[in-house]
């Protein structure tokens, strides 16, 4: 089955994959950013920490629901949940980052070799989830149109610290036609579990971003004339916090390479 799915992937249309099919191809070694994959299903960020630091991070997420909206928590040593019923959190994301004392140690497609039974995993909502709603309402999503990863930036917006964890918020940016900015705000505000409405619209310097062409994570996108940069809180914030707070060990998804869950995006939509 995995070979068949990989073959389909190379023929295009990853948006038609079920979450199980997408996880299979990533488990088989395909590395790709996941924007546009498995349309209609929620995507998620991952941070995995030793159990002794798990409560501090849980408190950090509770104090910072905009960048860290929790969709689920896996207990120490647990590798699957109802969000990925047949899955394995250690192998079903296309690319992982392993941090040691705040430093990026490696970027790998599988973390089973470094897995420990004391590790607690946090599954955090991702804004890729609401991109289907934007597209269905005629709002363009430039990084998908350009075949790129979404650009992400560290900002001057502080987070609320908890225990050992503190650091700046990370945001994702999508250039939106000026006449459709209000639509983008209205549509995404209905998805609070996957970052919700933007945190900033317009001048990037106002939130500490000096150059949109030089993102801290992801890829720069061409910004069409007549568009305005719109910024959403981003679930890469925990990686920024890991780099700032320097825990002994952490596993995260590589930015833009998300966990595709079995949850429908409509489950996270509010009226």
Curated annotation (Swiss-Prot):
It is an enzyme of class 4 (lyase). It comes from the Bacteria. InterPro entries: D-Glu_cyclase, Putative_hydro-lyase, UPF0317. Pfam families: D-Glu_cyclase. One of its GO terms (molecular function) is lyase activity. Keywords: Lyase. Coiled coil: none annotated. Its EC number is 4.2.1.-. Belongs to the D-glutamate cyclase family. This is Putative hydro-lyase jk0403. It comes from Corynebacterium jeikeium (strain K411).
């Amino acid at each position: 089955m995995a070979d068949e799915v990989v073959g389909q992937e190379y023929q295009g249309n990853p948006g038609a994959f079920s979450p199980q099919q997408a996880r299979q191809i990533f488990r088989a070694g395909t590395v790709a950013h996941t924007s546009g994959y498995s349309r209609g299903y929620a995507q998620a960020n991952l941070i995995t920490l030793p159990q002794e630091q798990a409560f501090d991070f849980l408190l950090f997420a509770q104090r910072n629901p905009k960048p860290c909206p929790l969709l689920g928590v896996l207990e120490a040593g647990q590798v699957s949940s109802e969000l990925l019923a047949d899955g394995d959190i250690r192998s079903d994301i296309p690319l992982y980052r392993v941090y040691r004392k705040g430093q990026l140690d490696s970027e790998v497609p599988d973390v089973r070799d470094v897995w420990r039974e004391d590790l607690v995993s946090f599954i955090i909502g991702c804004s890729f989830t609401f991109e289907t709603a934007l597209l269905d309402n005629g709002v363009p999503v430039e990084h998908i149109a350009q075949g790129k990863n979404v650009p992400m930036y560290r900002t001057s917006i502080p987070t609320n610290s908890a225990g050992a964890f503190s650091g700046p918020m990370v945001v994702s940016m999508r250039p939106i036609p000026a006449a459709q900015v209000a639509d983008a705000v209205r549509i995404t505000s209905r998805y609070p579990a996957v970052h919700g409405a933007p945190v900033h619209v317009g001048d990037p310097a106002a939130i500490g971003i000096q150059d949109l062409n030089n993102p801290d994570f992801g890829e720069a996108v061409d910004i069409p004339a007549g568009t305005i940069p719109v910024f959403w809180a981003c679930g890469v914030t925990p990686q920024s916090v890991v780099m700032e707070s320097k825990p002994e060990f952490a596993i995260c998804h590589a930015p833009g390479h998300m966990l595709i869950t079995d949850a429908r995006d409509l489950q996270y939509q509010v009226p």
